[in-house]
Amino acid sequence: MPITPRNIVRHELIGLECRVVKSLGPPYEGLEGRIVDETKNTLVLKTESGEKVIVKDQVLLELKLPSGERVRVDGALLVGRPEERLSKRIKYAEVVRGRFDPEDYLD
Protein backbone atom coordinates (compact mmCIF):
# COMPACT_ATOMS: atom_id res chain seq x y z
CA MET A 1 0.00 0.00 0.00
CA PRO A 2 1.57 3.33 -1.02
CA ILE A 3 2.06 6.08 1.54
CA THR A 4 -0.50 8.87 1.15
CA PRO A 5 -1.53 11.86 3.30
CA ARG A 6 -4.53 9.82 4.44
CA ASN A 7 -2.48 6.89 5.78
CA ILE A 8 0.85 8.50 6.73
CA VAL A 9 0.19 8.10 10.46
CA ARG A 10 -0.02 4.32 10.07
CA HIS A 11 3.12 3.92 7.98
CA GLU A 12 6.78 3.40 8.73
CA LEU A 13 8.51 6.79 8.70
CA ILE A 14 12.13 5.65 8.39
CA GLY A 15 13.60 6.81 5.10
CA LEU A 16 11.28 9.78 4.60
CA GLU A 17 12.63 13.31 4.20
CA CYS A 18 11.45 15.50 7.07
CA ARG A 19 11.44 19.17 8.06
CA VAL A 20 10.42 20.58 11.44
CA VAL A 21 7.99 23.40 10.63
CA LYS A 22 7.14 24.43 14.19
CA SER A 23 8.35 23.41 17.64
CA LEU A 24 6.66 23.78 21.03
CA GLY A 25 9.72 22.81 23.04
CA PRO A 26 13.47 22.84 22.37
CA PRO A 27 14.68 24.69 19.27
CA TYR A 28 13.97 22.00 16.66
CA GLU A 29 12.38 24.46 14.24
CA GLY A 30 14.00 24.41 10.82
CA LEU A 31 15.77 21.06 11.22
CA GLU A 32 15.78 19.09 7.98
CA GLY A 33 16.95 15.61 7.18
CA ARG A 34 16.08 11.99 6.56
CA ILE A 35 14.43 9.94 9.30
CA VAL A 36 16.89 7.15 10.17
CA ASP A 37 15.34 5.78 13.36
CA GLU A 38 12.13 5.95 15.33
CA THR A 39 11.20 5.13 18.91
CA LYS A 40 7.88 5.46 20.68
CA ASN A 41 8.44 9.14 21.49
CA THR A 42 11.28 10.30 19.25
CA LEU A 43 12.52 10.50 15.69
CA VAL A 44 16.19 10.54 14.71
CA LEU A 45 16.97 12.80 11.76
CA LYS A 46 20.19 12.53 9.81
CA THR A 47 21.05 16.15 9.02
CA GLU A 48 24.06 17.80 7.41
CA SER A 49 25.50 18.39 10.89
CA GLY A 50 24.91 14.86 12.20
CA GLU A 51 22.05 12.96 13.79
CA LYS A 52 19.47 14.92 15.78
CA VAL A 53 16.86 13.42 18.11
CA ILE A 54 13.51 15.21 18.16
CA VAL A 55 10.56 14.58 20.46
CA LYS A 56 7.47 13.71 18.40
CA ASP A 57 4.83 15.44 20.50
CA GLN A 58 6.70 18.78 20.44
CA VAL A 59 6.74 19.39 16.69
CA LEU A 60 4.79 20.00 13.51
CA LEU A 61 6.51 18.00 10.76
CA GLU A 62 6.50 18.29 7.01
CA LEU A 63 7.13 14.87 5.49
CA LYS A 64 8.01 14.28 1.86
CA LEU A 65 6.23 11.18 0.59
CA PRO A 66 7.82 8.84 -2.00
CA SER A 67 5.43 10.34 -4.58
CA GLY A 68 7.04 13.75 -3.98
CA GLU A 69 3.94 15.09 -2.25
CA ARG A 70 4.49 16.91 1.05
CA VAL A 71 2.21 16.59 4.06
CA ARG A 72 2.27 18.35 7.41
CA VAL A 73 1.51 16.24 10.47
CA ASP A 74 1.28 17.10 14.16
CA GLY A 75 3.97 14.94 15.77
CA ALA A 76 1.59 14.08 18.63
CA LEU A 77 -0.32 11.87 16.17
CA LEU A 78 2.89 9.91 15.56
CA VAL A 79 3.57 9.04 19.20
CA GLY A 80 3.87 5.28 19.51
CA ARG A 81 5.71 2.59 17.63
CA PRO A 82 4.61 2.00 14.02
CA GLU A 83 3.00 -1.31 14.96
CA GLU A 84 1.03 0.44 17.74
CA ARG A 85 -0.12 3.21 15.41
CA LEU A 86 -1.73 0.63 13.12
CA SER A 87 -4.47 0.01 15.65
CA LYS A 88 -5.09 3.71 16.42
CA ARG A 89 -8.28 5.14 15.02
CA ILE A 90 -7.28 8.49 13.63
CA LYS A 91 -9.49 10.56 11.39
CA TYR A 92 -7.92 12.27 8.40
CA ALA A 93 -9.14 15.61 9.76
CA GLU A 94 -6.83 15.11 12.77
CA VAL A 95 -3.87 14.79 10.42
CA VAL A 96 -4.58 18.11 8.73
CA ARG A 97 -5.79 19.91 11.88
CA GLY A 98 -3.87 19.63 15.10
CA ARG A 99 -2.65 21.71 18.01
CA PHE A 100 -0.84 24.29 15.90
CA ASP A 101 -2.25 27.40 14.20
CA PRO A 102 -4.14 26.60 10.98
CA GLU A 103 -1.70 28.78 9.01
CA ASP A 104 1.15 26.48 10.06
CA TYR A 105 -0.40 23.66 8.04
CA LEU A 106 -0.30 25.69 4.82
CA ASP A 107 2.70 26.18 2.54
From Swiss-Prot:
Primary location recorded for the protein, binned into one broad class: cytoplasm
Location relative to the cell: Cytoplasm
InterPro entries listed in its UniProt record: RNase_P/MRP_Rpp29_sf, RNP1, Rof/RNase_P-like, Rpp29/RNP1
EC code: 3.1.26.5
Enzyme's top EC category: hydrolase
MF terms in GO: ribonuclease P activity; RNA binding
GO terms for cellular component: cytoplasm; ribonuclease P complex
Catalytic activity: Endonucleolytic cleavage of RNA, removing 5'-extranucleotides from tRNA precursor
Pfam families: RNase_P-MRP_p29
One GO term of the biological process aspect: tRNA 5'-leader removal
Keywords: Cytoplasm, Endonuclease, Hydrolase, Nuclease, tRNA processing
Highest rank taxon of the organism: Archaea
SUPFAM superfamilies referenced in this protein's UniProt entry, alphabetically: Rof/RNase P subunit-like
Family note: Belongs to the eukaryotic/archaeal RNase P protein component 1 family.
Chain's role: Part of ribonuclease P, a protein complex that generates mature tRNA molecules by cleaving their 5'-ends.
Entry protein name: Ribonuclease P protein component 1
The organism of origin for this protein: Methanopyrus kandleri (strain AV19 / DSM 6324 / JCM 9639 / NBRC 100938)
